[in-house]
Amino acid sequence: MPKTVLSDMKTHMEKTVAVLKAEFQKVRTGRASTAILDSVKMDYYGNPTPISQIATLAIPEPRMITITPWEAKQISVIEKAIFNANIGLTPSNDGKSIRLSLPPLTEERRREIVKDLKKMAEDNRVALRNIRRDAIDRLKKLEKDKSITEDELKKYEKEVQDNTKSFEIKIDEAMTNKEKEVMEV
């Protein structure tokens, strides 16, 4: 039973870190990344569809993304979806493809982005601590129900704490890497 508590906790913590890393990928840095468009959905025959599923996305230059739709008639719909997504980029349409030019980030904007990243990281650290608290509560309940001894409880609590620390380190590493990427000119 305690092993189930620990494996559930690990699974939740892994998901928390994975979600943070996915959120970090969406954050605009000085370089072009197709991840910026992951949240942009467009109406494709009545269904909200990610742009990546109906067009080829490419990065021909460090600060440019090109979108080439597989169906030419979808170009205006994609363009409208990008405008409506409010991602801070203005599409330019040449009839066959859409180009998104990423303006260089100012020092002030870079600092704002880093501040937002730190808030995201802290929110995820809080989520890890909540997962840790829930796991410890479940273990204490097992001890109260006499499923495990007090010594086993202490051992499992230490394991929970060690796992929490290792996942916090992963969050810190992801934060440091993303901060370097954002601050790089």
From Swiss-Prot:
Any one biological process term the GO annotation gives? cytoplasmic translational termination
Q: Which UniProt keywords apply?
A: Cytoplasm, Protein biosynthesis
Highest taxon of source: Bacteria
Q: Which GO terms describe its cellular component?
A: cytosol
Q: Which GO terms describe its molecular function?
A: ribosomal large subunit binding
Its subcellular locations are:
Cytoplasm
PANTHER family reported for this sequence? MITOCHONDRIAL RIBOSOME RECYCLING FACTOR PSEUDO 1 (PTHR20982:SF3), RIBOSOME RECYCLING FACTOR (PTHR20982)
Q: Which family does it belong to?
A: Belongs to the RRF family.
Q: What is this protein called?
A: Ribosome-recycling factor
Native species of this protein?
Answer: Pelobacter propionicus (strain DSM 2379 / NBRC 103807 / OttBd1)
Upper lineage is: Bacteria, Pseudomonadati, Thermodesulfobacteriota, Desulfuromonadia, Desulfuromonadales
Gene for this chain:
frr
